[in-house]
């Protein structure tokens, strides 16, 4: 009897999605041959809700190892809206279960980040056979040491910091580089250290703008005519640490700085230190393009292991890497949790030893 396996990619795109899809497909075809059929759900959970899917062939998975983005398309379908019936009167959970049944799926593989995993867990609790795969450049999925896409994003952010050094030095400027990472600062911490940033500001460690300015002035007194500040997009200051997210976001918008902290930090540094300060936001560049060699290997490991889980009929789990071993975690154990940079993180100690200010 043929096994029918569905695959979807949900949430923001990142390097390594296609490499993971390929890893799953090649391993399934190698194990089952003609006794497996792969169904691509288009545009994430949105396609699962609307019944938008297609039958895939082996040809669909050729030449995609190095391809950025996702051949299946993706959309953000927030978990908090999954049980909300909107103006279209669609019961999203019931619709997803219907598509699963109509497509005659034996199981569904969900590639995505924290929100994707929460919905995957919901579907597993609803009785569907679900396997998750951890995708995010933020590296913040609980229960895994690394997610595919993270290392490529760090490489890109590091190159940005590298290039900013020369222009900062030439113009005697302070440069604030905004790195993706809303709730967790892993990309900023890694790229900040790799790129030689002088100040690194993370969501987990509320910064004091006076300490930031003091670090800039201290470098100037020692003869450095520029400073590099790596800022996570989710960084908050000590005042905001006592507020709800909606409250401090509203205050930022009202002040004309936008939702992230970077522009406000730059304005304060220039005002307090007198040094010309500029902002650089690489933005979606960090999510685009071909995955690094590391992420291609990791994606292939994860994809092939997911195929093994399909063979074992082990569902309600997500793939993870722990201590250099690929394992499976139960979805119910990791869904809704965030892997933040802990205070005892070795890289924070390294940064402090190097004289890097953490705000």
Question: Where are the model-predicted features located?
Answer:
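Short, ordered loop/turn segments at secondary-structure junctions
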Residues: 10-13, 41-46, 76-77, 113-116, ...
